[in-house]
A protein has these predicted regions:
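Conserved mid-core segment of classical short-chain dehydrogenase/reductases
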Residues: 25-40, 83
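Active-site helix of classical SDR
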Residues: 54, 90
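Residue(s) in the substrate-gating loop at a strand-loop-helix junction
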Residues: 74
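Active-site-adjacent segment of SDR/Rossmann-fold oxidoreductases
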Residues: 79, 100-111
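Active-site loop-to-helix junction immediately N-terminal to the catalytic Tyr of the SDR YXXXK motif
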Residues: 80-88, 100, 128
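C-terminal helical subdomain
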Residues: 114, 130-165
Length: 193
């Protein structure tokens, strides 16, 4: 990524906008040793890929004193979800990493936007065998993500209904969350990473 960023910057200068949007998901269990390899792969793509993309452009944008760095995380990053521990952990790490980057670039003229979508109709979610509330089409999700980035929102949860759900989940006492999460549907485990 660094080489590609260097080539881009040498040719065009610091970009006005960089969006890091990569993600993989697979059902995992924390109590299965075999799933550690899946965890490693999910973290590599969802966290390291996002960080490497944004970090490659951040110095030039900081030097230019302008621009927006946007990372796509997920509402799944707000609480650990059963059967999706790797995905939840990766998106939680992405949210926290973007928050740290925002603090580091404060006052530089470079905005850092973290977008946390709920369910989007993509090949990745089509394998889910459970109801996905407030499912957005890819086109509608893209429109809402663009609006959030243009507004330079520090944290954008879309759709708004998922923002309410995520607030409720974060405010929920641990003992209650544990009981409800134990009954939640799991991601399919037979999807390759």
């Amino acid at each position: 990524m660094e080489g590609a960023a260097r080539d881009f910057i040498a040719r065009f200068g610091a970009p006005d906008l960089v969006i890091a949007n990569a993600g993989v998901s697979v059902g995992t269990r924390g109590d299965e040793v075999a799933d550690v390899a899946k965890l490693r792969r999910v973290l590599e793509v969802n966290v390291t890929g996002l960080a490497a993309t944004l970090a490659a452009f951040a110095p030039a944008m900081r030097e230019a004193g302008r621009g927006t760095l946007a990372g796509i995380a997920s509402v799944a990053g707000f609480r650990g979800l059963p059967g999706a521990g790797a995905y939840s952990a990766s998106k939680s790490a992405a949210i926290t990493w973007l928050e740290s980057l925002r603090a580091e670039l404060h006052g530089s003229g470079v905005a850092v936007v973290c977008v946390c979508p709920g369910y989007i109709d993509t090949p990745m979610t089509r394998v889910n065998r459970f109801r996905m509330p407030f499912l957005l089409s890819a086109d509608e999700a893209a429109r809402r993500i663009v609006r959030a980035i243009e507004a330079r929102r520090r944290l954008a949860v879309i759709p708004w209904q998922m923002a309410l759900v995520s607030l409720a989940l974060r405010a929920m006492p641990g003992w209650l969350f544990d009981r409800l999460a134990a009954r939640a549907p799991r991601e399919p485990k037979d999807v390759p990473v």
